[in-house]
């Protein structure tokens, strides 16, 4: 079992009662939501009536209801709205976005997902991608956030990962911690990269790195003048001239 924690919401008022977890789900399995009340009583919740179908399905939780399933193996964010006793299951297929990336800020360049059950990690990787010396983030869902029902209105989940700090920071060849809605990553030099976003399923921590495999030298500064030297012209004694 995995414990749900406070959801990374965008601009939600204090006291918003939504918890959730990023987790890898398999299409050949199922799951329920186990709730333990203050007296230690356990209730298993399954699928009840559908509350909303877009942009992701939200359902009412039903005690003893049908277990939840997904159509495809993959990473999902499971959000539980405790105020209304509802559940939303959101596919989280990450890509890279930003003016450093091929699609600029217009869309996500797809990454390839892999799940390591032994190490309990999920990695999204893209290889041989050309990045400019600009900025980037990681994003899914085609938008910066995804809204789902809450108390007659909506709340928005951050669907982008950035640097775990207040200001933009360079992405390096060592993993740096990320957070939902975090600051942009800065690409230090233009070139061809292998970029990885990793999730540790045991801690819920995302981290990212970018390894340059070929530096772009097309914009390198060249000298304004060059000279030929040798026997035909005489060898100067002062090589600084």
Where in this protein do the model-derived segments appear?
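Insoluble glucan recognition modules
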Residues: 1-241
């Amino acid at each position: 079992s995995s414990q749900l924690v406070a959801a990374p919401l965008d601009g939600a008022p204090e006291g918003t009662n939504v918890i959730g977890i990023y987790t890898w789900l398999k299409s050949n399995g199922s799951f329920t939501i186990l709730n333990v009340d203050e007296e230690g009583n356990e209730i298993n919740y399954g699928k009840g009536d559908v509350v909303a179908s877009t942009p992701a399905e939200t359902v009412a939780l039903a005690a003893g209801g049908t277990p939840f399933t997904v159509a495809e193996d993959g990473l999902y964010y499971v959000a539980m709205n405790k105020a209304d006793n509802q559940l939303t299951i959101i596919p989280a297929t990450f890509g890279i976005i930003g003016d450093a990336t091929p699609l600029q800020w217009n869309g996500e360049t797809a990454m390839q997902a892999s799940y390591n059950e032994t190490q309990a990690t999920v990695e999204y990787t893209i290889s041989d991608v050309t990045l400019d010396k600009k900025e980037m983030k990681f994003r899914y869902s085609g938008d910066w956030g995804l809204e789902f029902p809450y108390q007659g209105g909506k709340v928005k989940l951050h669907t982008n990962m950035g640097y775990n700090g207040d200001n933009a920071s360079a992405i390096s060849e060592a993993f740096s911690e990320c957070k939902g809605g975090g600051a942009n990553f800065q690409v230090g030099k233009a070139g061809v990269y292998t970029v990885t976003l990793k999730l540790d399923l045991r801690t819920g921590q995302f981290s990212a790195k970018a390894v340059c495999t070929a530096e772009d030298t097309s914009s390198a500064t060249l000298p304004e003048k060059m000279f030929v030297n040798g026997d035909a012209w005489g060898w100067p004694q002062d090589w600084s001239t």
